[in-house]
């Protein structure tokens, strides 16, 4: 993947999405389709954006019992997305089942990455709401190591943790870092963020 920039299509309709993508004259950015757009438009939005020549990260964060995730991943694999994800907290067994479901009969599959801790989560909320007392970066590293052990290609993590993840899992292990914001920009409900310039310097 290198250091691809993934553009979020955080819209509630196909019309808004295509109007946005039409602004990229002559370019076909790697795009993220999240829950809002996918639940509004269904698989057809994936097929149409793919038909337009874009690479797609389908960001649905699956988290369920292993067999349900396995069957769901088999469906997503047929959509020919380039990358999709799940929650690492679903256990190694769930992640292994996801790989099985995602792998096509010819042995190919989309890139599969695991969400470690959402960038809206901080130490306080992790301890009080999730009853996880370990330091957040330690939890992220543990989840990343589990994802690698289960055969996944990478993780979603804060840009603050990407360098440490590569130190543990190797430089080829994919890190997708959603918490990248301009210094004077609105960070919304994100807690663990970094500026684009700082993120660029992370290995």
Model-predicted segments: where are they?
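Conserved anion-binding
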Residues: 2, 68-153, 161, 168-172, ...
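Conserved beta-strand positions in the central sheet of alpha/beta enzyme cores
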Residues: 6, 32, 57, 82-85, ...
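Short, acidic/polar
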Residues: 12-23, 67-75, 136-146, 191-198
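Acidic (Asp/Glu)-rich catalytic clusters
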Residues: 21-26, 44-53, 74-78, 100-106, ...
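Metabolite-binding pocket within alpha/beta catalytic cores that recognizes anionic/polar moieties
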Residues: 30-83
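A C-terminal functional module that forms or caps the active site or interfaces directly
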Residues: 43, 157-198
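Conserved small/polar residues in nucleotide/adenosyl-binding loops
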Residues: 200-203
